[in-house]
Amino acid sequence: MSHLILVRHGQSQWNLENKFTGWKNVPLTKKGEIEAKKAGELIKKHKIHIDYIFSSVLERANKTAEIAIIEANLTNLINNNKLIMTRNENLNERDYGDLVGLNKEETANKFGKEQVHIWRRSYDTPPPNGESLKDVVKRVSPYFIKHIKPLIFKGKNVLI
């Protein structure tokens, strides 16, 4: 039986500052590093073998995976002290466009809470110059179907 393991990146500096992050490279906080270690502890505790790792190209996601895999002691995924991981921008999180870098509370005060809620939670209404959730699905799904789904169907365990 194969497993698909989904791990969200640990807290980033902009998560802490309540800012829209999108595709901006923002480092993990100390709390984010601890969260990544806890993910690794859970993988180890449940004896989950991982065959493949896929990630966005964003450093916070890559660092989370690296910390978790080291903590889980999955040496099969490390070569020459580097994590064996496929990085692809099709797996990046949502692009918030013109909202990137803005404080969420200040943005709600400027544009109205309802409008910001629509931009964040509506399926097909993107923020200005950003992606809707529909756009994200359109970007991620073909990559997932082509590169990840076949591995799962072959019985491999994949961490994203």
Which residue stretches match the model-derived regions?
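Extreme N-terminal starter segment of soluble prokaryotic enzymes
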Residues: 1-5
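Short, well-ordered beta-to-alpha junction loops that form the rim of enzyme active sites
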Residues: 10, 55-58, 90, 121, ...
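Loop-to-helix element that buttresses phosphate recognition and phosphoryl-transfer chemistry
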Residues: 11-67, 71, 108, 126-142
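Short secondary-structure boundary/capping segments
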Residues: 18, 76-77, 150
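Phosphate-coordination/substrate-recognition cap region in phosphate-metabolizing enzymes
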Residues: 39-117, 145-146
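GST-like fold's C-terminal all-alpha helical module
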Residues: 135-160
